[in-house]
């Protein structure tokens, strides 16, 4: 990850912090920003979706998504589910 990408993610997370959302992550997937928040903050994100999208698009993301799985530490590269044989 480059310094530029880290800075972009940090600024995107600050947008959420400014809305009072403390436990959050913005995951960088190229043109996509994947937002993770605690389940209790999901409604706040939905209520502010226009503001959040506008701010993250201005940072250079092309798409802004919300991960319905919520905030998970270490979910940048989730493991593939395993199947029993």
Indicate residue ranges for each PLM-predicted region.
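ATP/NTP-dependent adenylation/nucleotidyl-transfer catalytic domains that generate, transfer
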Residues: 1-85
């Amino acid at each position: 990850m480059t310094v530029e990408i880290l800075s972009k993610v940090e600024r995107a997370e600050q947008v959420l912090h400014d809305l009072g959302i403390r436990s959050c992550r913005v995951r960088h997937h190229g043109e996509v920003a994947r937002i993770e928040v605690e389940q209790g903050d999901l409604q706040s994100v939905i209520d502010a979706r226009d503001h959040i999208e506008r701010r993250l698009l201005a940072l250079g993301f092309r798409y802004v998504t919300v991960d319905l799985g919520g905030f998970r530490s270490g979910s940048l590269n989730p493991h593939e589910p395993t199947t029993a044989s």
